[in-house]
Swiss-Prot record:
It comes from the Bacteria. The lineage of its organism: Bacteria, Bacillati, Cyanobacteriota, Cyanophyceae, Nostocales. It is found in: Cytoplasm. This is Ribosomal RNA small subunit methyltransferase G. HAMAP family: 16SrRNA_methyltr_G.
Protein backbone atom coordinates (compact mmCIF):
# COMPACT_ATOMS: atom_id res chain seq x y z
CA UNK A 1 0.00 0.00 0.00
CA UNK A 2 1.24 3.49 -0.87
CA UNK A 3 1.96 5.81 2.05
CA UNK A 4 -0.18 8.90 1.68
CA UNK A 5 1.09 12.34 2.55
CA UNK A 6 -1.23 14.39 4.77
CA UNK A 7 -2.96 17.26 2.95
CA UNK A 8 -2.70 19.74 5.83
CA UNK A 9 -4.77 22.37 4.01
CA UNK A 10 -5.62 24.24 7.23
CA UNK A 11 -2.02 24.30 8.46
CA UNK A 12 -0.74 25.51 5.07
CA UNK A 13 -3.30 28.32 5.22
CA UNK A 14 -2.69 29.27 8.85
CA UNK A 15 1.12 29.23 8.67
CA UNK A 16 1.91 30.40 5.12
CA UNK A 17 -1.40 31.94 4.01
CA UNK A 18 -1.19 29.58 1.04
CA UNK A 19 -2.57 26.22 -0.03
CA UNK A 20 -1.43 23.76 -2.70
CA UNK A 21 -3.72 23.22 -5.67
CA UNK A 22 -5.02 19.71 -6.35
CA UNK A 23 -2.30 19.31 -8.98
CA UNK A 24 0.43 20.48 -6.57
CA UNK A 25 -0.81 18.07 -3.89
CA UNK A 26 -0.62 15.25 -6.45
CA UNK A 27 2.94 16.34 -7.33
CA UNK A 28 3.90 16.36 -3.62
CA UNK A 29 2.55 12.81 -3.29
CA UNK A 30 4.38 11.59 -6.40
CA UNK A 31 7.61 13.28 -5.22
CA UNK A 32 7.28 11.47 -1.89
CA UNK A 33 6.81 8.11 -3.65
CA UNK A 34 9.79 8.73 -5.95
CA UNK A 35 12.04 9.67 -3.02
CA UNK A 36 11.02 6.52 -1.12
CA UNK A 37 11.85 4.46 -4.23
CA UNK A 38 15.17 6.27 -4.76
CA UNK A 39 16.09 5.78 -1.10
CA UNK A 40 16.52 2.05 -1.75
CA UNK A 41 19.56 2.72 -3.96
CA UNK A 42 20.75 6.12 -2.74
CA UNK A 43 21.06 7.60 0.71
CA UNK A 44 18.67 10.49 -0.04
CA UNK A 45 16.94 11.13 3.28
CA UNK A 46 16.33 9.48 6.63
CA UNK A 47 12.97 11.30 6.77
CA UNK A 48 10.46 8.81 5.35
CA UNK A 49 7.44 9.01 7.67
CA UNK A 50 4.62 10.84 5.79
CA UNK A 51 3.99 13.51 8.44
CA UNK A 52 7.69 14.10 9.07
CA UNK A 53 8.35 14.28 5.31
CA UNK A 54 5.54 16.82 4.94
CA UNK A 55 6.91 19.02 7.73
CA UNK A 56 10.68 18.76 7.29
CA UNK A 57 10.86 18.60 3.50
CA UNK A 58 7.74 20.23 2.05
CA UNK A 59 6.60 22.76 4.65
CA UNK A 60 10.15 23.73 5.63
CA UNK A 61 11.17 24.23 1.97
CA UNK A 62 8.26 26.59 1.34
CA UNK A 63 8.50 28.46 4.66
CA UNK A 64 11.86 29.82 3.50
CA UNK A 65 10.36 31.31 0.33
CA UNK A 66 7.35 32.86 2.06
CA UNK A 67 8.01 36.26 0.37
CA UNK A 68 7.82 34.50 -3.03
CA UNK A 69 4.61 32.61 -2.20
CA UNK A 70 2.94 35.86 -1.17
CA UNK A 71 4.01 37.51 -4.43
CA UNK A 72 5.90 40.25 -2.55
CA UNK A 73 9.29 39.55 -4.07
CA UNK A 74 10.30 40.98 -7.44
CA UNK A 75 11.05 40.11 -10.20
CA UNK A 76 7.91 38.39 -11.50
CA UNK A 77 9.89 35.50 -13.08
CA UNK A 78 12.88 34.93 -10.79
CA UNK A 79 15.93 32.82 -11.62
CA UNK A 80 16.76 30.62 -8.63
CA UNK A 81 19.63 28.28 -7.76
CA UNK A 82 19.47 25.61 -5.04
CA UNK A 83 23.02 24.89 -3.84
CA UNK A 84 23.77 21.38 -2.56
CA UNK A 85 20.22 20.31 -3.36
CA UNK A 86 20.74 16.64 -2.38
CA UNK A 87 17.36 14.94 -2.76
CA UNK A 88 15.93 18.16 -4.25
CA UNK A 89 15.11 20.26 -1.19
CA UNK A 90 14.19 23.05 -1.10
CA UNK A 91 14.45 23.41 -4.91
CA UNK A 92 11.91 20.87 -6.18
CA UNK A 93 8.99 21.98 -3.94
CA UNK A 94 9.83 25.59 -4.87
CA UNK A 95 9.72 24.68 -8.58
CA UNK A 96 6.28 23.10 -8.07
CA UNK A 97 4.80 26.08 -6.27
CA UNK A 98 6.41 29.01 -8.12
CA UNK A 99 5.75 27.95 -11.74
CA UNK A 100 6.90 31.30 -13.22
CA UNK A 101 10.44 30.81 -11.84
CA UNK A 102 13.36 28.99 -13.44
CA UNK A 103 15.36 26.83 -11.04
CA UNK A 104 18.81 25.30 -11.24
CA UNK A 105 19.53 22.40 -8.88
CA UNK A 106 23.25 22.12 -8.06
CA UNK A 107 24.87 19.11 -6.41
CA UNK A 108 28.37 17.66 -6.51
CA UNK A 109 27.15 14.03 -6.59
CA UNK A 110 26.41 12.69 -10.07
CA UNK A 111 24.14 9.89 -8.76
CA UNK A 112 21.88 12.39 -7.00
CA UNK A 113 21.68 14.60 -10.09
CA UNK A 114 20.80 11.58 -12.28
CA UNK A 115 18.04 10.72 -9.78
CA UNK A 116 16.78 14.32 -9.84
CA UNK A 117 16.74 14.35 -13.66
CA UNK A 118 14.36 11.37 -13.51
CA UNK A 119 12.18 13.13 -10.92
CA UNK A 120 11.93 16.27 -13.06
CA UNK A 121 10.81 14.17 -16.03
CA UNK A 122 8.29 12.21 -13.92
CA UNK A 123 6.82 15.41 -12.45
CA UNK A 124 6.95 17.31 -15.77
CA UNK A 125 8.84 20.20 -14.14
CA UNK A 126 9.98 22.00 -17.27
CA UNK A 127 11.10 25.10 -15.32
CA UNK A 128 13.94 23.20 -13.63
CA UNK A 129 17.39 22.01 -14.70
CA UNK A 130 20.32 20.34 -12.96
CA UNK A 131 24.09 20.82 -12.77
CA UNK A 132 26.75 18.53 -11.31
CA UNK A 133 29.35 20.74 -9.67
CA UNK A 134 30.73 22.52 -6.64
CA UNK A 135 29.56 25.95 -5.48
CA UNK A 136 33.17 27.19 -5.36
CA UNK A 137 33.65 26.41 -9.06
CA UNK A 138 30.20 27.46 -10.29
CA UNK A 139 30.60 30.79 -8.45
CA UNK A 140 33.63 31.60 -10.61
CA UNK A 141 31.97 30.48 -13.87
CA UNK A 142 30.94 33.43 -16.10
CA UNK A 143 27.66 31.70 -17.01
CA UNK A 144 26.61 31.47 -13.35
CA UNK A 145 28.38 34.27 -11.49
CA UNK A 146 25.97 37.18 -10.89
CA UNK A 147 23.29 35.27 -12.83
CA UNK A 148 20.57 34.56 -10.24
CA UNK A 149 17.87 36.53 -8.43
CA UNK A 150 17.62 34.08 -5.52
CA UNK A 151 20.04 31.48 -4.09
CA UNK A 152 18.76 28.80 -1.69
CA UNK A 153 20.93 26.69 0.61
CA UNK A 154 20.31 24.42 3.59
CA UNK A 155 23.05 25.24 6.10
CA UNK A 156 24.88 22.25 7.47
CA UNK A 157 28.14 24.01 8.38
CA UNK A 158 29.16 27.57 9.20
CA UNK A 159 26.72 30.11 7.80
CA UNK A 160 29.62 32.25 6.55
CA UNK A 161 30.42 29.33 4.20
CA UNK A 162 26.84 29.48 2.90
CA UNK A 163 27.28 33.22 2.32
CA UNK A 164 30.46 32.58 0.32
CA UNK A 165 28.65 29.96 -1.78
CA UNK A 166 25.54 32.07 -2.46
CA UNK A 167 26.46 35.76 -2.79
CA UNK A 168 28.85 35.47 -5.80
CA UNK A 169 26.03 33.78 -7.77
CA UNK A 170 23.55 36.60 -7.17
CA UNK A 171 22.81 39.61 -9.34
CA UNK A 172 23.01 43.01 -7.65
CA UNK A 173 19.90 43.22 -5.45
CA UNK A 174 19.57 39.42 -5.34
CA UNK A 175 18.55 37.47 -2.23
CA UNK A 176 20.26 34.52 -0.52
CA UNK A 177 17.98 32.38 1.66
CA UNK A 178 19.83 30.19 4.15
CA UNK A 179 17.80 27.46 5.89
CA UNK A 180 19.08 26.80 9.39
CA UNK A 181 18.17 25.00 12.63
CA UNK A 182 19.59 26.74 15.69
CA UNK A 183 20.97 30.27 15.70
CA UNK A 184 22.96 32.40 18.17
CA UNK A 185 23.86 36.09 18.45
CA UNK A 186 27.55 35.19 18.08
CA UNK A 187 26.72 33.72 14.67
CA UNK A 188 25.08 37.00 13.64
CA UNK A 189 28.28 38.91 14.52
CA UNK A 190 30.51 36.45 12.63
CA UNK A 191 28.16 36.43 9.65
CA UNK A 192 28.04 40.25 9.43
CA UNK A 193 31.80 40.40 8.87
CA UNK A 194 31.74 37.68 6.19
CA UNK A 195 28.74 39.13 4.38
CA UNK A 196 30.31 42.59 4.25
CA UNK A 197 33.43 41.13 2.58
CA UNK A 198 31.22 39.41 -0.01
CA UNK A 199 29.17 42.47 -1.00
CA UNK A 200 26.06 41.68 1.01
CA UNK A 201 24.06 42.71 4.07
CA UNK A 202 21.96 40.68 6.49
CA UNK A 203 18.43 41.70 5.59
CA UNK A 204 16.67 39.65 8.26
CA UNK A 205 16.92 36.57 10.44
CA UNK A 206 13.54 34.95 11.04
CA UNK A 207 12.88 32.49 13.84
CA UNK A 208 9.84 30.25 13.57
CA UNK A 209 8.38 27.04 14.98
CA UNK A 210 7.51 24.08 12.77
CA UNK A 211 3.78 23.26 12.87
CA UNK A 212 3.86 19.56 13.89
CA UNK A 213 6.99 18.86 15.95
CA UNK A 214 7.27 22.47 17.21
CA UNK A 215 10.99 22.61 16.46
CA UNK A 216 12.77 25.97 16.34
CA UNK A 217 14.07 26.86 12.89
CA UNK A 218 15.63 29.96 11.32
CA UNK A 219 15.85 31.49 7.89
CA UNK A 220 18.65 33.95 7.22
CA UNK A 221 18.06 36.40 4.35
CA UNK A 222 21.09 38.10 2.79
CA UNK A 223 20.80 40.89 0.22
CA UNK A 224 23.51 41.44 -2.40
CA UNK A 225 24.22 45.19 -2.42
CA UNK A 226 27.66 45.37 -4.07
CA UNK A 227 29.82 43.36 -6.45
CA UNK A 228 31.50 40.36 -4.81
CA UNK A 229 35.32 40.67 -5.02
CA UNK A 230 36.81 38.37 -7.68
CA UNK A 231 38.67 36.17 -5.18
CA UNK A 232 35.35 34.83 -3.82
CA UNK A 233 34.34 32.07 -3.74
CA UNK A 234 37.77 30.73 -2.89
CA UNK A 235 38.96 27.38 -4.37
CA UNK A 236 37.23 24.07 -3.58
CA UNK A 237 37.49 23.15 0.10
CA UNK A 238 38.93 26.47 1.29
CA UNK A 239 35.63 28.06 2.47
CA UNK A 240 34.91 25.10 4.78
CA UNK A 241 38.51 24.80 6.02
CA UNK A 242 38.96 28.54 6.61
CA UNK A 243 35.51 30.16 7.04
CA UNK A 244 35.51 33.95 6.64
Amino acid sequence: MTNLLPEMAEIWQQTLNWQPTVQQQEQFQRLYELILEGNRQLNLTRITDPQEFWEKHLWDSLRGILPLLSGNLPPASPTIIDIGTGAGFPGVPVAMTVPNCTITLLDSTQKKITFLDNILTELALTNTKTIVGRAEKIGQHPQHRMAYDIALIRAVGAVSVCAEYTLPLLKQGGLAIIYRGNWTKDETTALQNAVKLLGGVIESIEQFTTPLSHSIRHCVYLRKVATTPVQFPRPIGVPTQKPL
